[in-house]
Amino acid sequence: MAREYKIEDYRNFGIMAHIDAGKTTMTERILFYTGKNHKIGETHDGASTMDWMEQEQERGITITSAATTTFWQGRDGKKRRFNIIDTPGHVDFTIEVERSLRVLDGAIALLDANAGVEPQTETVWRQAEKYHVPRMVFVNKMDKIGADFYRSVEMVGSRLGAVALPVQLPIGAENDFVGVVDLIEMKALTWDGTIGAPATVGEIPADMADKAEEYREKLIELAVEIDEAAMEAYLEGTMPTNDELRALIRKGTIEVKFHPILCGTAFKNRGVQPLLDAVVEFLPAPTDVPAIKGIDVKTETETTRESSDEAPLSMLAFKIMNDPFVGSLTFARIYSGKLTKGVSLENTVKGKRERIGRMLQMHSNSREDIDEAFAGDIVALAGLKETTTGDTLCDPLKPVILERMEFPDPVIEIAIEPKTKADQEKMGIALNRLAAEDPSFRVKSDEESGQTIIAGMGELHLDILVDRMKREFKVEANVGAPQVAYRESITRAAEIDYTHKKQSGGSGQFARVKIIFEPHDGDDFIFESKIVGGSVPKEYIPGVQKGIESVMGAGPLAGFPMLGVKATLIDGAYHDVDSSVLAFEIASRAAFREGAQKAGAQLLEPIMKVEVVTPEDYVGDVIGDLNSRRGQISGTEARGIATVVNAMVPLANMFGYVNSLRSMSQGRAQYTMQFDHYEPVPTAVAQEIQKKFA
């Protein structure tokens, strides 16, 4: 089967927004107008097509990006293929947004006309900047009380530091919102609000004529700056034609020089069709964005893969989902080449082969089987065994590793245990499945307590995962409070001379060791033997090292593992009959226990490197709060229109920080933290910890 749509007629885009900007409703309308949906699902009925996980339908928020393919006939009468990725708008799911932005070519940022640019819009916008994604803005909910298009446009500049390019103006607002002025065609488009009705094209209302002229002039001035020839012609008094103007806006949008702004109300069906036309006219096709970079596995040099069916096959797995009917589905974006059912591909990140069995084209939650797919397509693959998010699948003869996605480290850990014996086995399976789907969720076993620890991006993130475990895997679990992993070390040198003797009829046990224990700068354990003259035979020395290592897992203060200890064996004695490796092991164990006490044992805590990105208004509060958490500020710097505060803070004082930061900055600041080093715990705090764990 040959390709049905030319790659130039593809638009791979997503809709990004703050949690309540109406994203799901907008996606529903797009699917309706492009002919895929026959009954529109409303979010507030919990019946929306894109939000297909049960929790999403209950909470009315979008958690999982579902990919959907649909089609739209543009103004020129030509049909285009849209691949739409739905992205979540909640801060605990930013990983999902990062993932989808990574594989998109363009995006529509949705704003609530009443609230304008909200905190999560800033976060997602910054992520899109990082991947250099061309964006348009749609000011939604123009029918809402307090809707203000002009304020929203101003906020795109002041809050996002972006160049706004209105290509429409609203006619009326709140209850009186009826349509828009098209600043390119200089016509009024109005809708009567019935579902699916086309716009009525008419003249611009007299009271808006001057404003429309003023905004069109600004539009042309910004657009011609993109192209020298157009700029020269404009300065000589030649206006661009409407088609030339569209071409200039397209060029500037794709180069991320400015962002076209449109408006409407998805819920009331006003302004949706012009937005779809704008996707065709202003957002890039896969061939309009730079070719994806990667590393050639054979030569280990940088290479690129062009968006072409003729290039070697390369694709990036960007999402894994459990589908109730098909099992595990891997969503992948094909960047180059052609994919056929039944072929065997190389997973270059894992170094494993994968056979492509079943290939699906997804519509929100229905699916169609396909036999082949091409560059630019987004497909769902069933039954891949080894592939996880961020892996590359490619032609085994031309292996490449495409740019890896970067996933933030989890910031919150809690212990989890099955409620009953029956839940025990199921819990392990469920947690491993969830971790395969979500790279920002980690599972580990705590060697010290034997508990299972889960870690994620925030409290809502872990809540939802525990909830999914209950629903999808029928596992009931108890969840504990967040915990810190402390360590112990020593502060000075101590020399210990210890003899182990045991006589119990027949051969006994004898070993004498003389060891110096001292602190060193690293975190590891160093063992050295300075035995000369055979006072401890060579074959017994490994027993000395093994004995010390076996007790370093539990320090003398509160039973935490020990770090940064050096042990030097300087002397000893043995007995021809009674000595053995085991005897030396026992002697060195006892010597270490005595030495750790004498060498000034101390408690260490993990110190986190914290970076807070905040609007300037909240810098003082953020710094004050970090200081109150025993944090040390290492500096501040400007990043765009935000300020970055860097600090070192003990992990023990960072629990619940996401919520304090949210309320302190009205949700506009965000933070990341990662482990940096261990540091001694202040005496007063150490005493409390010892009491608790002793």
Swiss-Prot record:
Family: Belongs to the TRAFAC class translation factor GTPase superfamily. Classic translation factor GTPase family. EF-G/EF-2 subfamily.
Family annotation (SMART domains): EFG_C, EFG_IV
tr-type G domain: residues covered: 8-287
Gene it is expressed from: fusA
Main location: cytoplasm
Alphabetical list of PROSITE patterns matching this protein: G_TR_1, G_TR_2
Membrane-crossing segments per the record: none
Location(s), subcellular: Cytoplasm
Pfam families the record matches: EFG_C (PF00679), EFG_III (PF14492), EFG_IV (PF03764), GTP_EFTU (PF00009), GTP_EFTU_D2 (PF03144)
GO CC term, one of those recorded: cytoplasm
Sites where the protein binds GTP: 17-24, 86-90, 140-143
Species this chain originates from: Brucella canis (strain ATCC 23365 / NCTC 10854 / RM-666)
A biological-process GO annotation: ribosome disassembly
A single MF term (Gene Ontology): guanosine tetraphosphate binding
Known role: Catalyzes the GTP-dependent ribosomal translocation step during translation elongation. During this step, the ribosome changes from the pre-translocational (PRE) to the post-translocational (POST) state as the newly formed A-site-bound peptidyl-tRNA and P-site-bound deacylated tRNA move to the P and E sites, respectively. Catalyzes the coordinated movement of the two tRNA molecules, the mRNA and conformational changes in the ribosome.
UniProt keyword annotations, A-Z: Cytoplasm, Elongation factor, GTP-binding, Nucleotide-binding, Protein biosynthesis
The name this protein goes by in its record: Elongation factor G
InterPro entries, alphabetized: EFG_II, EFG_III, EFG_III/V, EFG_IV, EFG_V, EFG_V-like, EFTu-like_2, G_TR_CS
